[in-house]
Amino acid sequence: MLTSFNNQKQQIEHSQTLSFAERGYAILPSLYEKELEVLRTIIRKKYIKTLEDFHIFDFTNDEFKQPFNYHNLSIENHSEIWGKQQRIFSEYESEEFLKFSLFDYLKNKFGFLKVADIEGIGYPEIYWRIVRPNKTEDVSGIHADSWFFTHTNKMTPKEQDNLLKIWIPIEVLPNEGGLGVYPGSHLKKWDYDTIKKDGRIKPKLNYLPNHEKILLPLKPGEPVIFDKNLLHYGVSHKADYTRVSIEFAIQVS
């Protein structure tokens, strides 16, 4: 276990010596604690309202009103409840998020222009995810976001120009799963299939890439930005909590 940990640490340290263009991702400065709490409050309110909309009111105690305790509830229609539409920030919530210091950093370092509206909702699209312990169906398989932009969202190459993706863990234990990446994989072409799921065309990779991968040990509020063509994947976890994260695409100059 120690050897594995040391190897992982060495891989991360080596990857960090490369430029963003070479590795295809970068870990950004953490959000301020007060900003992280704003996000937790937004998500908690949306979480409780969505459960109430599905007539789920029976919380044993207030702790179960916290998204990180969601896995302790007896929910039979999980996938029905948590469609993407239930997890998209409102326009007001998005505006509040755009006031965060993160966007000044993105403007200075990456030429940030705007948060993209991938689904055509009419305003900057930011959404959150929950991943229960020991539920591999809650995490995404290995993919590049450009595949979804192309097939699921029907975006042209021109519409995808200068798009980058950002993922921020809100509730996470760094050593119990989060986001895995394949550094440098955005510089290669990968074959993949497509399937129809939930009425939409989605990409699917049916093999394990012969390429180095790294699990990023991100802390709550520590964002990672990555190229739309970078191979990455959600990591399942076993710890007694529900992982919560947000993600969005940005357009840069």
Predicted regions and their residues:
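Non-heme Fe(II)-dependent double-stranded beta-helix
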Residues: 1-22, 29-142, 148
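A structural signal for short, well-ordered beta-strand segments and their strand-loop junctions
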Residues: 27-29, 117-125, 169, 178-182, ...
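Short, solvent-exposed loop/turn segments at secondary-structure junctions
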Residues: 32-35, 133, 147, 172-175, ...
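Acidic, His- and aromatic-enriched active-site or binding-groove loops in soluble protein domains
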Residues: 142-162
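Short, conserved, surface-exposed binding loops centered on an aromatic residue
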Residues: 155-160, 170-173, 215-217
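A short hydrophobic beta-strand segment most commonly corresponding to one strand
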Residues: 165-168, 240-253
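Double-stranded beta-helix
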Residues: 174-233
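Short proline/glycine-enriched turn/loop segments at secondary-structure junctions
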Residues: 235-239
